[in-house]
């Protein structure tokens, strides 16, 4: 059963402009986890495209959750990583994890599916939260 669907677009050029400012470090540390920041060096895409896709993924996730960034959810509660095959995945903690748990029907497990894409100047994220019977 589908619990929620969310999608978001982020303009890569907007992130490029932000990264060019001297206060960009504050922006990056506020929106992205240490793991995400560290991983940004390992990808061949530009840092702006890397961060734009992850920003879009976080926005898409809270839309799928049905809350947006209300209820004290922070960007740090949502971290985007890649599995061993390179597929993106959503990792949640804090208030985001608590709110997701409230959405889970009894005797079900939850899965978060994430798809990312970019075609300059746009980065796209699509999230589906699914509940499956145990």
From Swiss-Prot:
Keywords: Cytoplasm, Fatty acid biosynthesis, Fatty acid metabolism, Lipid biosynthesis, Lipid metabolism, Magnesium, Metal-binding, Transferase
Domain of life the protein comes from: Bacteria
EC code(s) of this entry: 2.7.8.7
Keyword Magnesium listed: yes
Residue sites binding Mg(2+) per the record: 8, 59
A GO BP entry: fatty acid biosynthetic process
Any one of the GO CC terms: cytoplasm
MF term (GO), any: holo-[acyl-carrier-protein] synthase activity
Pfam family, one: ACPS
Cofactors: Mg(2+)
Compartments where found: Cytoplasm
InterPro entries found in the cross-reference section: 4-PPantetheinyl_Trfase_dom, 4-PPantetheinyl_Trfase_dom_sf, ACPS, Ppantetheine-prot_Trfase_dom
Known catalytic reactions: apo-[ACP] + CoA = holo-[ACP] + adenosine 3',5'-bisphosphate + H(+)
Family from the record: Belongs to the P-Pant transferase superfamily. AcpS family.
Record-linked HAMAP family: AcpS
Function: Transfers the 4'-phosphopantetheine moiety from coenzyme A to a Ser of acyl-carrier-protein.
Protein's UniProt name: Holo-[acyl-carrier-protein] synthase
Gene that specifies this protein: acpS
